[in-house]
Amino acid sequence: MSDEMICLEEEANVAVKHVFRAELLNAIAKNDKGAFKKCVEQIGKDWHVSRTVETKDKYKFREDLWESRNAILAHEYTWNTYNDKKHYKAYSYRSKICFLLNPVYYKLIYDGLNKKALTEFYKSINDTRKVDKETWQETVEHYYSKLPFSPKDETDIDRIFREDFKLWAKDTVKTWIVKENGHIMYKRGLTPESAQELSV
């Protein structure tokens, strides 16, 4: 009988979110604009959204996020609007920074994977709502109302990070570390129930 099953990809994903969040918040606490912008740059590279901001606009983009840090923390920043004067959209990139800084409010990252997963979720319950960036926050709030979990404060952040992973990764084959009778095994599958032991 299995004592414990851990999803390797989930733990890695959640850990990275915690690390990035800590780096952003530490930079804000120290009023270190350079460290903040460096972290934003690294997030863009690691999460493959750097390309959504043209090279000539990257400095301005990171500067804008730094100037918007308090608005993001106070959930007064809207990432899904386009300002002609700033010449960039980068909706998913901005959503990721908002989510990391203020997960209790923003709750889910806006990107293609989560959009697809939410669209499929609403189809499965015969809800015809349109899932798009304009209605994203409203849709996310409604989605969370269907979960047996309602984030209230910072003690819920780890769970929020996990919910984000579980949504976009639900159709992804994962690696499971299984501790069984004092031994460790590795399995692959969509879920713990369907996972099969790796064979050499």
Residues of each region from the PLM?
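An N-terminal alpha-helical hairpin/helix-loop-helix interaction module that forms a charged
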Residues: 1-86, 104-200
